[in-house]
Amino acid sequence: SDGRLAHEMLVRAAKTTQTNVKGIDATAGMGEDAFLLAACGYEMMLYEQNPVVAVLLKDALRRAKKHPKLKDITARMQLVEGNSVDELKSRVDDIDLIYLDPMFPGRQKSGLINKKLQLIQKLEPPCSDEVELFEAAIQAKPSKIIVKRPLKSPFLAGKNPTYELKGKAIR
């Protein structure tokens, strides 16, 4: 429901008074975060560079578009297989929001992470150039850049945020 959606940290971070918001998820993974934003009415472009993950996401979106409760949300999600950095650098049309959730380096903690995340971590190496990704996002001149990080990790590209939300495990 919309009430629960409003409590999601990502939704709170993305909140805007604008309508027809266009967003880019530059590090789509399995697309859950972009799905949350699309559920809020955002038009989302998802970039996934790993071909295996992209195929899994493409299949999930294809199936979701046939589901009566999901089709309106997934209609606002467009998947592009490839690296988002080049696209962000050459972007000419306006974009309202860019979401970055690069794969974090493996944790030293032995706590079990869920199976889906384990699979993604096996398929996708940690982001090789976070600075390039962040600089490309800045170059695209969005109204807002949202970065998801583990609580204890350094800020992306060493840049302090202008605004920060903290949860139990992420900020």
Annotate each PLM feature.
Residues S1-G23, G31, A39, Y47-L97:
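S-adenosyl-L-methionine
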Residues K22, E43, R76, S143-K144:
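Residues at the starts of beta-strands that form the adenosine-phosphate
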Residues K22-L56:
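Basic (Lys/Arg-enriched) interaction patch that binds polyanionic ligands
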Residues G23-L36, I95-N114:
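Conserved proline-anchored active-site loop of SAM-dependent methyltransferases
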Residues N83-E87, P125-I138:
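A short, acidic, amphipathic alpha-helical segment used as a generic capping/interface helix at domain edges
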Residues P102-L133:
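Mobile active-site "lid"/loop adjacent to the S-adenosyl-L-methionine
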Residues E130-R171:
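Conserved Class I SAM-dependent methyltransferase catalytic core
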